[in-house]
């Protein structure tokens, strides 16, 4: 605990300020509450955009070889998908013409919409990448994995898409795809099968361009990186000789979701172990540009009482709910078809049906007060869903995306292709 607190204080002094309101120089005080395990995240969040801005001088002191951040890969920006643009903006490593993120870059990319910075991208030789990845196998594989690694990791674009999908989709679909590629039936896959799983999941997640909303041609054919990456070393070892069991992969998904949730909670709670309801509203509306945004903020000012707060556990339960938005939307269709408003009890029941869990009355009351556009104590659920999708996709959601049924149908189709290929490679001639 003392070591974590010391590291937090050092990072806070180095980072300077949090983009969304963390005061410069604020110290993180470790507590015995539920945020104790995540205390290092306060300082990492506090570093925020300021860290990226200071990266140039730090890199120069390290004597790293760098190239200008005027990345000519951006070219005609409108031809890149929203996710590709975000990846390019936050990536800080380059090897053999390919760009990569560090674990820190990834966390910042899901916390912040953009970074105002003039930065230099570090060019790495293959030996440099091996050095960067050297500590991954000994890192603690819990809910502080990415924070503990910091810059000691390499994340490819395919892995970036895969990690984003973990944050926005329920686990059930991953299990189906995992079992489809498990030709031995022991819920274990090898490295080459995991690469297929990444491409299958990432390929289907609606890679839309900014202006045309057409599927980007480059994304579905992203090639496998020519070097080891963070996830590959974490799951399969440096030489790729290990196998990955689904239970371990599920723990990784749960830990990743927990880590990002803790980081965002600390970001908007200003490092405290509770979040004011106004802070929760700010988190909800962070990536939202709806025309009713002013009405939502008026509701926050007029309907939410000063001093009321949201706990970390309540925040996590709400984030769990947001990974089941497609199922929740189906439950809401009965109200849309009947032209009926959604009242609190009906909303609560729909959440239970979609997720198997309940949201606290405190959370439900907060959501209803914010999204009651007409003052009739009913939820404007259509726009509420749009706001939540933008929130969970970190501003990268395109409304024309396919439904969850279409998504997993595509996943199943691609998984079958992967199974056929796996059988051919394993037996020379498969039963297909």
UniProtKB/Swiss-Prot annotation:
Changing residue 410 to A: Abolishes interaction with MICU2. GO terms for biological process: calcium import into the mitochondrion; cellular response to calcium ion; mitochondrial calcium ion transmembrane transport; negative regulation of mitochondrial calcium ion concentration; positive regulation of mitochondrial calcium ion concentration. Calcium sensor of the mitochondrial calcium uniporter (MCU) channel, which senses calcium level via its EF-hand domains. MICU1 and MICU2 form a disulfide-linked heterodimer that stimulates and inhibits MCU activity, depending on the concentration of calcium. At low calcium levels, MICU1 occludes the pore of the MCU channel, preventing mitochondrial calcium uptake. Keywords: Calcium, Disulfide bond, Membrane, Metal-binding, Mitochondrion, Mitochondrion inner membrane, Phosphoprotein, Repeat, Transit peptide. The keyword Calcium applies. Disruption phenotype: Mice display diastolic dysfunction, characterized by left atrial enlargement and delayed sarcomere relaxation and cytosolic calcium reuptake kinetics in cardiomyocytes. A significant proportion of mice die from abdominal aortic rupture. Residues 169-204, 224-259, 290-325, 359-394 form the EF-hand domain. Heterodimer; disulfide-linked; heterodimerizes with MICU1. Component of the uniplex complex, composed of MCU, EMRE/SMDT1, MICU1 and MICU2 in a 4:4:1:1 stoichiometry. It is found in: Mitochondrion intermembrane space; Mitochondrion inner membrane. This is Calcium uptake protein 2, mitochondrial. It comes from Mus musculus (Mouse). Residues 1-22 form a transit peptide. Predominantly expressed in stomach, intestine, skeletal muscle, kidney, heart, testis, prostate and uterus. CDD domains: EFh_MICU2 (cd16174). SMART domains: EFh. GO terms for molecular function: calcium channel regulator activity; calcium ion binding; calcium ion sensor activity; protein heterodimerization activity.
């Amino acid at each position: 605990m003392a070591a974590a607190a010391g590291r937090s204080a050092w990072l806070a002094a180095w980072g300077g300020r949090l983009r969304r309101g963390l005061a410069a120089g604020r110290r993180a005080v470790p507590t015995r509450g539920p945020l104790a395990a995540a205390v290092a995240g306060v300082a990492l969040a506090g570093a925020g955009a300021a860290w990226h801005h200071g990266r140039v001088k730090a890199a120069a002191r390290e004597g790293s070889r760098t190239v200008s951040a005027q990345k000519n890969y951006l070219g005609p920006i409108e031809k890149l998908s929203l996710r590709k643009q975000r990846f390019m903006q936050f990536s800080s490593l380059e090897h053999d013409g390919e760009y990569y993120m560090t674990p820190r870059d990834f966390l910042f990319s899901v916390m912040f919409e953009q970074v105002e910075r003039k930065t230099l991208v570090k060019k790495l030789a293959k030996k440099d990448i091996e050095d960067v990845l050297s500590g991954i196998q000994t890192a603690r594989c819990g809910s502080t994995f990415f924070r503990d690694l910091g810059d000691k990791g390499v994340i490819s674009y395919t892995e970036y898409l895969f990690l984003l999908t973990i944050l926005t989709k329920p686990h059930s679909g991953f299990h189906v795809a995992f079992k489809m590629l498990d030709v031995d039936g022991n819920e274990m896959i090898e490295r080459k099968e995991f690469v297929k799983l990444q491409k299958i999941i990432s390929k289907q997640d609606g890679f839309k361009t900014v202006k045309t909303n057409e599927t980007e041609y480059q994304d579905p054919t992203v090639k496998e990186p020519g070097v080891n990456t963070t996830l590959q070393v974490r799951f399969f070892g440096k030489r790729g000789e290990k196998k990955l069991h689904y239970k371990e992969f599920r723990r990784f998904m749960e830990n990743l979701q927990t880590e990002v949730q803790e980081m965002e909670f600390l970001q908007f709670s200003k490092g405290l172990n509770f979040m004011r309801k106004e802070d929760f509203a700010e988190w909800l509306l962070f990536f939202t540009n709806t025309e009713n945004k002013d009405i939502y903020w008026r509701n926050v000012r007029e309907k939410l009482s000063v001093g009321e707060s949201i706990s970390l556990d309540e925040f996590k339960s709400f984030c769990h709910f947001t990974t089941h938005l497609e199922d929740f939307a189906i439950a809401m269709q009965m109200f849309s078809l009947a032209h009926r408003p959604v009242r609190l009890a009906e909303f609560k029941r729909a959440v239970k049906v979609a997720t198997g869990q309940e949201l606290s009355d405190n959370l439900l009351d907060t959501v209803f007060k914010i999204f009651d556009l007409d003052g009739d104590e009913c939820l404007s659920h259509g726009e509420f869903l749009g706001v939540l999708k933008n929130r969970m996709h970190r501003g990268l959601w395109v409304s024309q995306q396919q439904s969850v049924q279409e998504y997993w149908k595509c996943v199943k189709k691609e998984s079958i292709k992967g199974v056929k290929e796996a059988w051919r490679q394993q037996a020379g001639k498969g039963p297909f």
